[in-house]
Every structure is written in C-alpha cells, then in structure tokens.
C-alpha cells in the first residue's frame, strides 16, 4: 500500500470523477484520475513538492494537482494518509475542519 485514502477522500475522488464525466467526457475523467493517482504516488515517494497547511496544523501537508489541492499527513512508518482532495474554488478550510481527527 503506497498511500491511504480516508473515506471522505474517497468520496472526494468519486465526486471529482462524476463532475468531470458530466461536464467534460469519460476520456477527460479517466485522464484526470490518472493525474491524481500519479500525484498520490509522488506524495508516497516524497518526490512531490508540498507545503505545510498552517502553523495550527503542522502535520497536514498540501500539494496542488491541476485544479485540486490534496491534503495529507505523512505518518511515521506508515503510508501517507490522504484526507481530502478539494477544488481550488472551494472554501477549503471550512471543508477541512471535520477531517482533522
């Protein structure tokens, strides 16, 4: 297991796939899913450039992939835990509040 997706992050991915399929096409939806998957692997390999979300949550890192931000936590001796994949136009802090458990 290279990385772990929380239940809510899995829901984010499903929402992204549905939206992209509806607004664009199946090919675009598959392409975007591949881009996100590649970025998840880069996060797991620690080769993706990421920054700390804030001083209040120093354990939470954020990485941009196209029009989405991936929020995750690197765990000691465990795969990174991806807690959210949110669109750049969303109110991210509001949506992240319930994911810091």
Model-assigned labels for residue ranges:
Residues 73-101:
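Enriched for short, Lys/Arg-rich terminal
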Residues 17, 37, 83-86:
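Conserved protein kinase catalytic domain
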Residues 38, 48-79:
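Basic/aromatic recognition patch in beta-strand/loop cores that engages polyanionic ligands
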Residues 1-35:
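Arg/Lys-rich, positively charged N-terminal/basic patches that mediate binding to nucleic acids
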Residues 16, 46, 95-96:
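Residue-level signal for well-ordered alpha-helical positions
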């Amino acid at each position: 297991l290279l990385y772990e997706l929380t239940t809510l992050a899995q829901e984010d991915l499903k929402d992204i796939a549905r939206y992209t399929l509806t607004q664009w096409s199946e090919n675009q939806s598959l392409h975007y899913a591949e881009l996100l998957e590649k970025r998840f692997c880069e996060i797991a390999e620690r080769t993706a450039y990421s920054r700390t979300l804030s001083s209040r949550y120093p354990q939470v890192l954020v990485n941009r992939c196209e029009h989405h931000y991936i929020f995750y936590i690197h765990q000691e001796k465990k795969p990174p835990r991806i807690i959210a994949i949110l669109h750049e136009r969303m109110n991210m802090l509001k949506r992240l509040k319930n994911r810091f458990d």
